[in-house]
């Protein structure tokens, strides 16, 4: 029961944080609206959500740059918004 409560709290924190705007369940990018991609959940690759494309300074995945992507996206991060590139910044990749 304690583990369940911790998971619920964690999900609530993530859902209300700036970096995890969840807009709806999906299977592929074409099911999401403009400016979003169908990203895999950080907890389970079988669960995907429509997530906004990355803004300047936000974390990104360098191999995940095509929208819409034809297959099932494996990354939990969306590509950067149009006009931005995903480049290495320190130990992470960020949209710039």
From Swiss-Prot:
Q: Name one GO molecular function term.
A: toxin activity
- Could you list the residue ranges forming a coiled coil in this record? none
Which tissues and organs express this gene's product? Answer: Expressed by the skin glands.
Name one cellular component (GO) term.
extracellular region
Q: What is its main location?
A: secreted
Cell compartment(s), UniProt: Secreted
Q: Which cysteines are joined by disulfide bonds?
A: 26-38, 32-50, 37-78, 60-86, 80-95
Q: Give GO terms for biological process.
A: endothelial cell proliferation
Task: Tell whether Transport is among the UniProt keywords.
Answer: no
Extract the signal peptide range. 1-19
Keywords in alphabetical order: Disulfide bond, G-protein coupled receptor impairing toxin, Secreted, Signal, Toxin
* Function, in words: Potent agonist for both PKR1/PROKR1 and PKR2/PROKR2, and inducer of a potent and long-lasting hyperalgesia. Also potentiates capsaicin-induced TRPV1 current, when tested on DRG neurons. At subnanomolar concentrations, this protein both induces potent chemotaxis of macrophages and stimulates LPS-induced production of the pro-inflammatory cytokines IL-1 and IL-12. In vivo, potently stimulates the contraction of the guinea-pig gastrointestinal (GI) smooth muscle (nanomolar concentration).
Family assignment from sequence similarity: Belongs to the AVIT (prokineticin) family.
Q: What is this protein called?
A: Prokineticin Bo8
């Amino acid at each position: 029961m304690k583990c369940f409560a911790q998971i619920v709290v964690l999900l609530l924190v993530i859902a209300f944080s700036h970096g995890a705007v969840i807009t709806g369940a999906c299977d592929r990018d074409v099911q999401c609206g403009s400016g979003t991609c169908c990203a895999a959940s950080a907890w389970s690759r079988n669960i995907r959500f429509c997530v906004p494309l990355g803004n300047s300074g936000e974390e990104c995945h360098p191999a995940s740059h095509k929208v819409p992507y034809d297959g099932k996206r494996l990354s939990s991060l969306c590509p950067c918004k149009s006009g931005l590139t995903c480049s290495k910044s320190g130990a992470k990749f960020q949209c710039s």
